[in-house]
Amino acid sequence: MNNFYLEIPSIKRKEDIIDYINELEQYNSEINGIELLAKILDGYSFEETLENCLKRSNKEYAIKNGKNQVNTYLLIRKSDNKIVGAINIRLNYGSGINKFNGNIGYGIRPTERRKGYNKINLYLGLLEAEKLGLEKVTLACESTNIASIKIIESLGGILNYSEIDPSDGNLTNIYIINVKETINKYKNI
């Protein structure tokens, strides 16, 4: 875990972020953890998406605009300074948290998968969630996503219930993680 850290997106990472998003698109991969910045795929400029991303991480802005606060982070590998993943933490101040999204969304770029990085990504995200005052978080994943299920459960996630997501018709598992308990129990991952 000491080989990775989370970083708030910035203009200095513009090319790296665009490369990360393009890789997700190239592999037809779901865009998780970096949705606000992925608006570049809809024709918005990087600068516009970055500005919106940073605004959405501000509690006052979220409350004023009736939106959820969304804090987005990039998972950086220290050895080569490469973005290998992303995670966002959603706090409810306005429109409510969609139970099929949960408090946390996260993902790893396709060329870096199956290396154990997403467990580190989620753990570091839980550290940020604790700083934001979250005691428990909900995470959602499709019931067929075995990799995500294993990651969530390996960090103490407890299946709360499963339900059909009306947006896509897929059975979705909703998990709860006790933030402090998980941080203390798994700090040596």
Where are the regions a protein language model picked out?
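Charged catalytic carboxylate motif
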Residues: D16, N121, A147
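Conserved GNAT acetyl-CoA-binding A-motif
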Residues: A129-A140
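Conserved acetyl-CoA-binding loop-helix of GNAT-fold acetyltransferases
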Residues: G105-I108, R114-L127, K150-S154
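Conserved catalytic-core motifs of GNAT/GCN5-like acyltransferases
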Residues: A140-C141, G156-I174
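Structural motif
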Residues: L132, S154-L155
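GNAT-family acyltransferases
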Residues: M1-N103, D168-I189
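Conserved beta-strand-loop-alpha-helix junction that forms the acyl-donor binding cleft
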Residues: R113, L139-I149
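Conserved G/P- and acidic residue-centered "switch" motifs that form tight phosphate/ATP-binding loops
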Residues: N81, G116, N145
